[in-house]
Amino acid sequence: LCTGALLHDIGKVFIPKDLITKEGPLTYEEFLKIKEHPRLGYNYINKSPSIKSCIKVIALQHHERIDGLGYPNALKGDAINKLAKIVSIADVYDALTSDRCYRRALCASDALEYIMANVNKLFDFNIVQVFSKIIVPFPFGTIVKLSTGDIAVVQETQLNYPLRPV
């Protein structure tokens, strides 16, 4: 899993840098080119017999989606490797919580909320459940603004409700 997570985007080295770092919206043709990176990465690491097949599959499938609308093969549900499903969630969380040349980073709670809102569409329900227990957007001691407008300090997190600290 760790090696697959490290290598999942290796195909991006074959995409022109100006396309990867483009500040404005991508054209349809540019997006098609970006969508080639999983297959390019898979083809590259597939040449190495010392790299395990599960790592290669992660590189190929990390943009597949539960609803079948992902790429490069439009796989659906259980046809997607479990490790690729895990890396997919981590990849999206990382993308959302990192500054990009075209947008500012989201806070951890907004990124987690996005992932949870896309269960059974983009992401596997069971894996999101585990992920949401590992990623704590409001750890102990975090200063938060309540819906009432009051300021509070998080004293405890709720395992089943990560977006509702106490």
Model segments located where?
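Histidine- and acidic-residue-rich, metal-dependent catalytic cores
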Residues: 1-166
